[in-house]
Amino acid sequence: MIDGDGYRLNVGIVICNNHGQVFWAKRYGQHSWQFPQGGIDDGESPEQAMFRELYEEVGLTKKDVKVIATSRHWLRYKLPKRLVRWDSQPVCIGQKQKWFLLRLECDESKINMQRGSSPEFDGWRWVSYWYPVRQVVSFKRDVYRRAMKEFASLAMPFKERKVKGKRNTHRG
């Protein structure tokens, strides 16, 4: 679905593990990495699209994850002019995304990128929470930064933190 402004309605998916790391996927046959994402079909809610894309791209189902949060607003990015398909109608100039923060609830061995009819990814790894903001293709950076900033306080509790501070050396 493309809205009246030329943006394709889309979902973005951030999957966290219990160590505060996020799932980072390598695009099929390319050297670029990104979060799973995909278009919203006619008649589909953002949440339905997210679960469909999660299965098609990562091989996970609703029972394999817990939805922690959804972005408050739609986040948009424009495609570079060289990537716009000017000959297709309606013309899509970018993506308008609803983002989801998920926590992995199953063993990571269930991740299977070969479930969809044409795989989007051919590799994946866990990375530190803020790593994707620095590493994603430049035209997506602002959207990634905004989504990750919104989810940060919710994602960080998954991480096992070391307690910082002075050690109590008082012996009474």
From Swiss-Prot:
UniProt entry keywords in alphabetical sequence: Hydrolase
GO molecular function: mRNA 5'-diphosphatase activity
Domain of life: Bacteria
EC number: 3.6.1.-
Protein's job: Accelerates the degradation of transcripts by removing pyrophosphate from the 5'-end of triphosphorylated RNA, leading to a more labile monophosphorylated state that can stimulate subsequent ribonuclease cleavage.
Cofactor(s) in the UniProt record: a divalent metal cation
Protein name: RNA pyrophosphohydrolase
Segments forming domain Nudix hydrolase: 6-149
Residue ranges annotated as motif Nudix box: 38-59
InterPro entries: Nudix_hydrolase (IPR020476), NUDIX_hydrolase-like_dom_sf (IPR015797), NUDIX_hydrolase_CS (IPR020084), NUDIX_hydrolase_dom (IPR000086), RppH (IPR022927)
Pfam families on file: NUDIX (PF00293)
GO cellular component, one term: cytoplasm
Name of the gene this protein is made from: rppH
Lineage summary: Bacteria, Pseudomonadati, Pseudomonadota, Gammaproteobacteria, Vibrionales
BP GO annotations: mRNA catabolic process
Record family assignment: Belongs to the Nudix hydrolase family. RppH subfamily.
